[in-house]
From Swiss-Prot:
InterPro entries: Beta_galactosidase_C, Beta_galactosidase_Trimer, Class_I_gatase-like, Glyco_hydro_42, Glyco_hydro_42_N, Glyco_hydro_b, Glycoside_hydrolase_SF. Substrate binds at R121, N159, W326, E366, K367, W368, H369. It comes from the Bacteria. It comes from Bifidobacterium longum subsp. infantis. GO terms for biological process: galactose metabolic process. It catalyses: Hydrolysis of terminal non-reducing beta-D-galactose residues in beta-D-galactosides. Keywords: Glycosidase, Hydrolase. It is an enzyme of class 3 (hydrolase). Specific for beta-D-anomer-linked galactoside substrates. Hydrolyzes o-nitrophenyl-beta-D-galactopyranoside (ONPG), chromogen 5-bromo-4-chloro-3-indolyl-beta-D-galactopyranoside (X-gal) and to a lesser extent lactose. Hydrolyzes p-nitrophenyl-beta-D-galacturonide very slightly. Does not hydrolyze maltose, sucrose, raffinose or melibiose. Has some transgalactosylation activity yielding galacto-oligosaccharides (GaOS), including O-beta-D-galactopyranosyl-(1,3)-O-beta-D-galactopyranosyl-(1-4)-D-glucopyranose. GO terms for molecular function: beta-galactosidase activity. This is Beta-galactosidase III. GO terms for cellular component: beta-galactosidase complex.
């Protein structure tokens, strides 16, 4: 799959390259007399780019065929003359009320047949030819009007596709799904084979009999092959819509373009890796997860975004200065986290740090969502932090950070959107296992052992790493299977977990015992699964291992171990369970490489405790013992080595003391002792040095 050529928004004429800094700006929500104050405050904060007109369709086209760009012209002119570039939105994120009144057929339909009414956002369906015509018309009008504007440096196409309209079960979608299946499979017999329709008398005679996976009754089970393809189709339908908008803009005004993804550990709405091939530069919206996993999940998501971008620079298009508005409890950021979180994304490869939004709304559904200028105004800690961050970003740019990229790790944790979709089905061995949790646990456990891993999509170049983790990768296609086998045979070091290689890319089980097509690579054969839980008293709710760890939720029944393999850890259990002394963790020699197999869900803590022995078995070196796990070290460097930056993040609630090598550039909640070449990094603190 080919990537579009990478294109990055360039600075305004006469300006030098900077780390792009600010985010969504919604001047149409405020009286015009506020605009001049906004621009002055932006200059004070070091802002150099804003995204404008994302949800402005009703103001850009107040009546059908009547366009008003005058207000937007004035905004862009004020910004540009102040040295602030514009990432201009297509304006098509949500249709105006006049359109939905005239054309209710553009509204998406849920699986029970209920129509999504206007009143919020993103109530349009991706397969509506009517809505597509309106959207493309606005794109062309925007492109024509702003094609020669010197202050517009990039296109922001729509917004967070699929956030609310991921699935549409309308008649438009039904016809599009039929065409998608015909293109993918060619014949209806091939569809029947792929979906296993011989089961439950679901065989179809022609493509017109294909329908979306609508409501089938409470407690029933949808055909899993069909459901997996439906998720693929839904992602592709939105992708096709985006590409149509993109092409309409670029045909007239060929500026760098993007659309904002929603990459996080648990957000798998679309196949963002596939989408990443069709943008000029990757951009992402990330909102922190409150609690003890806050930093680790954020770092993981940033690493995955970097993997989707194939280590090209990427935009952090949205994150928050503090609380969001859409959780049951909207926790604020702790002191220091505004700066630390932004620098974490920067460390992981982002060359743009942007927020939702510039000025906190005084009305509307997101009025309680934090912003760079909060309700309290510029005399606030949030705005002071915003200004501090702006100065830090300018300093790092002056020191040459923009010439660097995230330094490649020795370990790649593989992530697969389709494996997550497959594990979401309601008829699986257990509902407690989902693909997305295991990569995050491995990322955290590796960090506990001094290794900051890269997170690489399954289509990505993971086989170029010294070591690779396949964490509950339920789907192993024939192509991926070949890559795995070649990787280990040629000397690769592989970690494989339970729930990996169960099915192929049609969701058909690999027969002969698990893990399917790579049993000989890992050197074990699993005959059966042993899910665990607390809902049936008298059954197993956990399993102890003889290395001091505990398995929960899931374990493999490993019935044979190859002569080329040896057991690293075994289960300790009552005789009645059949698990006492059974293999739990093994290492196998395969070709010139080694493959470790972890046959149970150990969680972050169990993995962290098991990894030292496994890392030693596979010959993978880790960091010094004295700071293991307390501090995350991330490096950015250029190809020449002239510019090399080290970011040190305290991921604990205690002060972390580290040795300092190089020149300290940014110290947020960190005190540097220059005479002793050490630094004390406070909780939520970060230190950036240049080697």
């Amino acid at each position: 799959m080919e990537h579009r050529a990478f294109k990055w928004p360039q600075p305004l004429a006469g300006n030098k390259p900077r780390i792009w800094y600010v985010g969504d700006y919604n001047p149409d929500q405020w009286p015009e007399e506020v605009w001049d104050e906004d621009v002055a405050l932006m200059q004070q904060a070091g802002v150099n780019l804003v995204s404008v007109a994302i949800f402005s369709w009703a103001k850009l086209e107040p009546e059908e065929g009547v366009y008003d760009f005058d207000w937007l012209d004035r905004v862009i002119d004020k910004l540009g003359k102040a040295g602030i570039a514009v990432d201009l939105a297509s304006g098509t994120a949500s249709p105006p009320m006049w359109m939905t009144q005239a054309h209710p057929e553009i509204l998406w339909v849920d699986y029970r047949g209920d129509v999504c009414q206007p009143g919020a956002r993103q109530h349009w369906r991706a397969t509506s030819p009517v809505f597509l015509d309106y959207a493309l018309n606005l794109c062309r009008k925007m492109a024509e009007h702003y094609k020669d504007n010197p202050y517009v440096v990039s296109w922001h196409v729509s917004n967070e596709y699929g956030c609310h309209n991921r699935f549409d079960y309308s008649e438009d979608a039904e016809r599009a799904f039929q065409k998608w299946c015909e293109k993918k499979y060619g014949t209806i017999d091939a569809v029947n084979d792929a979906w296993g329709t011989a089961f439950w008398a679901q065989r179809m005679n022609n493509f017109s009999e294909i329908i979306p996976p609508r409501f089938i009754g409470d407690g029933n089970f949808m055909n899993p092959g069909k459901l997996l393809d439906w998720k693929r189709f839904s992602s592709d339908a939105l992708l096709d819509f985006y590409k149509a908008e993109r092409d309409a803009l670029l045909e007239i005004a060929p500026k760098p373009q993007t659309t904002n993804f929603m990459v996080s550990a648990g957000c798998t709405v679309l196949d963002y890796d596939k989408w990443g091939h069709d943008v000029d530069f990757v951009s992402n919206d990330h909102y922190f997860s409150p609690g003890e996993a806050h930093f680790d999940e954020m770092a993981y998501a940033a690493c995955l975004t970097d993997g989707i971008a194939r280590k090209n620079p990427w935009f952090l298009m949205e994150h928050s200065t503090s609380a969001v508005n859409w959780r049951p409890t909207n926790y604020r950021l702790e002191p220091g986290e505004l700066v630390r979180d932004s620098l974490a994304h920067l460390a992981m490869g982002a060359d743009a740090i942007c927020y939702f939004q510039w000025r906190q709304s005084k009305a509307g559904a997101e009025k309680w969502h934090s912003a760079m200028v909060p309700h309290a105004g510029p005399d606030s800690q949030i705005f002071r932090d915003v200004c501090e961050l702006g100065a830090d970003l300018n300093k790092l740019a002056d020191e040459g950070l923009l010439s660097t990229k995230l330094v490649k790790s020795k370990v790649a944790v593989v992530f697969d959107y389709e494996s997550q979709w497959a594990t979401e089905h309601t008829a699986t061995p257990t509902q407690e296992v989902r693909h997305w949790t295991e990569p995050l646990d491995w990322f955290r456990a590796l960090a506990d052992n001094g290794l900051t891993a890269d997170v690489v999509p399954v289509r990505g170049p993971w086989d170029e790493y010294e070591a690779v983790v396949l964490p509950s990768l339920a789907i192993l296609s024939e192509q991926t299977t070949r890559r795995v086998r070649e990787y280990v045979a040629n000397g690769g070091k592989l970690f494989v977990t339970y729930y990996t290689g169960l099915v192929d890319d049609r969701d058909h089980v690999w027969l002969g015992g698990y893990p399917g097509s790579i049993r000989d690579v890992v050197g074990v054969r699993v005959e059966e699964f042993a899910p665990m839980g607390t809902d049936a008293p008298g059954t197993m709710d956990h399993l102890d291992l003889d290395n001091g760890t505990v398995a929960h939720d899931f374990a493999d029944v490993i019935t044979s171990v190859a002569d080329t393999a040896h057991v690293v850890a075994s289960f300790k259990a009552d005789k009645w369970t059949g698990f006492d002394g059974a293999p739990a963790i093994t290492v196998n020699d395969f070709g010139d490489g080694k493959a470790a197999y972890v046959g149970a869900r150990l969680g972050r803590e169990g993995l962290a405790k098991s990894l030292p022995a496994l890392l030693e078995e596979l010959g993978i070196e880790t960091s010094a013992e004295d700071d293991r796990g307390e501090v995350v070290r991330v490096e950015r460097a250029d190809e020449t080595g002239e510019n090399h930056f080290v970011f040190l993040f305290n991921r604990t609630h205690d002060v972390a003391v580290v040795d300092v090598e190089g020149e300290p550039l940014v110290a947020s909640l960190a005190q540097v002792n220059e005479s002793e070449h050490t630094a004390a990094i406070q909780p939520n603190g970060v230190l950036v040095v240049k080697l």
